[in-house]
Amino acid sequence: MAVQQNKKSRSRRDMRRSHDALTTAAVSVDKASGETHLRHHVTADGYYRGRKVINK
């Protein structure tokens, strides 16, 4: 089992964790249908940037 040789300070621990924060997903509203979707993704209706790109 691995055992540390020297104790890491709170400062060094927190500096390491400074990049671990989570961000919320960027959500957009479609111009045509008003539906929310992920950026650069087609909506569930098949719209992308106000145009119908997938026929269902």
From Swiss-Prot:
Q: What GO biological process terms are annotated to this protein in UniProt?
A: translation
Q: A cellular component term (GO) from this record?
A: cytosolic large ribosomal subunit
Q: Which parts of the sequence are annotated with region: Disordered?
A: 1-37
Question: Transmembrane helix: present as a keyword of the record?
Answer: no
SUPFAM superfamilies (UniProt xref): Zn-binding ribosomal proteins
The UniProt regions of compositional bias labelled Basic residues, in chain numbering, are 7-16
Indicate the family of this protein: Belongs to the bacterial ribosomal protein bL32 family.
Q: Which NCBIfam families match?
A: rpmF_bact (TIGR01031)
List the protein's name: Large ribosomal subunit protein bL32
